[in-house]
Regions:
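Conserved C-terminal "switch" segment of AAA+ ATPases
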Residues: 1-65, 72, 76-77, 151-159, ...
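An alpha-helix initiation/capping motif
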Residues: 28, 43, 64-67, 87, ...
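Short hydrophobic/aromatic residue motifs in ordered secondary structure
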Residues: 41, 98-99
Length: 237
C-alpha cells in the first residue's frame, strides 16, 4: 500500500541524503501534505526539486522548488510554451475559480495549494490543486458529496459568469460520475438501492447499461442505478 506519514518521512529522508536541502525545507511538513504519494512519487518530488534548483544555479533546494515539484508530480508538467488566447485564459480563470471557491467554503475539502491557468502536459487548460488530504482510513458520505461539488464547481462558474458552458469540464464530470457510481454501487450510500454491492470494477460511466449487458442484474435494477447516479450528481450541482 501507499506509505503513511511516518513512512513518507522516512522515504524522504533516504532520498534527501545526497541532496543539498535548504534550511527552509521541512521534510516532516512535506510528509504531512503528500498523503497518497507513493515511494516513487516522493523520490521524483526530490529529484525534480533538485533539477529545478540546478537549473537556477542554486546551491540548495528551497521550499519554492519543492512546491513546483509537487505540482509537476501531482498534476503534470506545465506547458508554458503553449500559446493560448486572452479569451481562453479568462474562461480558464473563471472555471478554476469555481473549483477554488468550493475548496475554500466546503468544510471537508481543501485548502487550496495552487490555482493556475497554465495548460498542463495532460491536456488540461489549467488546474486547481488542493493540499493533499490527510491519511484517512475511510471516506464519509458527506466528504464524497463535497468532492463531487468541487468537481462541478468549474462548470457552475462557467454558467454563472459566462452564461455559457465549455468542454473544459469533461474530466470534472467524469470524476463526479465515478464518485457517484461508487457511492451507489460500492458503498451502500443510496437509500433507494440499499446495502447491496453492485460494483463490477468497471470504469463504464453508464453503470446500469453495463450491468444490464452483462446480465448481472435485471433491467429495472440497472435503470435504478443510473437514475441514482444521475440524481446524486444533479443534487450536488
Amino acid at each position: 500500500g501507499r506509505p503513511d506519514v511516518k513512512g513518507r518521512k522516512e522515504i524522504l529522508e533516504v532520498h534527501a541524503k545526497n541532496k543539498p536541502i535548504g534550511d527552509d525545507v521541512d521534510l516532516q511538513q512535506i510528509a504531512q501534505i503528500t498523503a497518497g504519494f507513493t515511494g516513487a512519487d516522493l523520490e521524483n518530488l526530490l529529484n525534480e526539486a533538485a533539477i529545478l534548483a540546478a537549473k537556477q544555479n542554486q546551491a540548495y533546494i528551497t521550499q519554492n522548488e519543492i512546491n513546483q515539484a509537487m505540482i509537476k508530480v501531482g498534476i503534470g508538467k506545465e506547458k508554458k510554451s503553449k500559446i493560448i488566447s486572452e479569451k481562453e485564459k479568462r474562461i480558464t480563470a473563471y472555471h478554476e475559480s469555481g473549483h477554488a471557491i468550493l475548496f475554500h467554503v466546503l468544510p471537508d475539502v481543501g485548502p487550496v495549494h495552487t490555482v493556475s491557468v497554465i495548460p498542463t502536459g495532460a491536456g488540461a487548460a489549467g488546474y486547481t490543486m488542493p493540499l493533499p488530504a490527510k491519511d484517512e482510513m475511510f471516506l464519509t458520505k458527506g466528504k464524497m458529496l463535497q468532492d463531487i461539488m468541487v468537481s462541478l464547481g468549474g462548470r457552475i462558474a462557467e454558467e454563472l459568469i459566462l452564461d455559457d458552458i465549455t468542454t473544459g469540464a469533461s474530466q470534472d464530470i467524469k470524476q463526479a460520475t465515478a464518485a457517484a457510481k461508487a457511492m451507489v454501487t460500492k458503498y451502500g450510500f443510496s437509500e433507494k438501492l440499499g446495502l447491496i454491492n453492485y460494483d463490477d470494477d468497471s470504469d463504464d460511466v453508464f453503470i446500469g447499461r453495463d450491468l444490464a449487458h452483462s446480465k448481472a442484474y435485471g433491467e429495472s435494477t440497472a435503470s435504478a442505478i443510473d437514475e441514482e447516479v444521475r440524481r446524486i450528481v444533479e443534487d450536488c450541482y
